[in-house]
């Protein structure tokens, strides 16, 4: 019995038709692990940064018609929410599990906060080959950093700084069949390794 990780069948919750039925599937197959990950990694971030982190599991409460295409747990230093702050995320679409750190378009002082990525431009480029960027958290697209030109990356960061709807996350994503999802031990090791790469961008 696993506590933290996800099986390929759990991702199929996003194939269930209808809002109520899909939410039921998400609640049964995905949300319990998100809560466990929330407990584990809020402690992890608190110990790594010296700041108190709180987990925020997506509720999808505002939805009245369209079922969610993804779900997540986010980590930030506010009990009230995470969207206004730089934050870490563990989440999933039907075809991927993703891990991210960055800034949403709703962030307070977004232009100032996004400049960390401008200052750490070289560090972004030096991330391992399987690291990606996400420029819209609502879409599954996450191009590999290694496939972006300098200009592509600079433009993406500038958009987060200057455009109201701009966002920027560094990310990592794996498929539902990935061997790192086969056990809690392998999954937690993958997540900790990823967050260790993200943390210098948080504390910069």
From Swiss-Prot:
SUPFAM superfamilies: YktB/PF0168-like (SSF142913). It comes from the Bacteria. Disulfide bonds: none annotated. It holds the Pfam family DUF1054. It comes from Staphylococcus aureus (strain MRSA252). Coiled coil: none annotated. Belongs to the UPF0637 family. InterPro entries: UPF0637, UPF0637_domain_sf. This is UPF0637 protein SAR1080.
């Amino acid at each position: 019995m696993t506590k933290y990780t996800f099986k390929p069948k759990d991702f199929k919750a996003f194939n269930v038709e209808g809002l109520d039925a899909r939410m039921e599937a998400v609640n049964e197959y995905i949300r319990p692990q998100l809560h466990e990950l929330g407990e584990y990694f809020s402690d992890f971030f608190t110990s790594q940064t010296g700041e108190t982190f709180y987990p925020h599991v997506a509720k999808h409460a505002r939805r009245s018609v369209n079922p969610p295409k993804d779900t997540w747990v986010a980590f930030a230093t506010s009990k009230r929410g995470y969207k206004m702050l730089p934050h870490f995320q563990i989440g999933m679409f039907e075809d991927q599990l993703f891990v991210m750190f960055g800034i949403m378009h709703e962030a307070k002082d977004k232009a100032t906060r996004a400049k960390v990525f401008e200052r750490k431009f070289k560090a972004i480029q030096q991330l391992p080959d399987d690291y990606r960027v996400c420029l819209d958290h609502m879409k599954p697209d996450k191009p590999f950093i290694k496939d972006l030109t300098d200009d592509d990356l600079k433009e993406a960061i500038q958009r987060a700084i200057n455009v109201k709807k701009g966002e920027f996350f560094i990310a990592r994503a794996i498929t539902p069949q990935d061997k790192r999802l086969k056990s809690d031990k392998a999954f937690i090791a993958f997540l900790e390794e990823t967050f260790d790469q993200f943390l210098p961008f948080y504390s910069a």
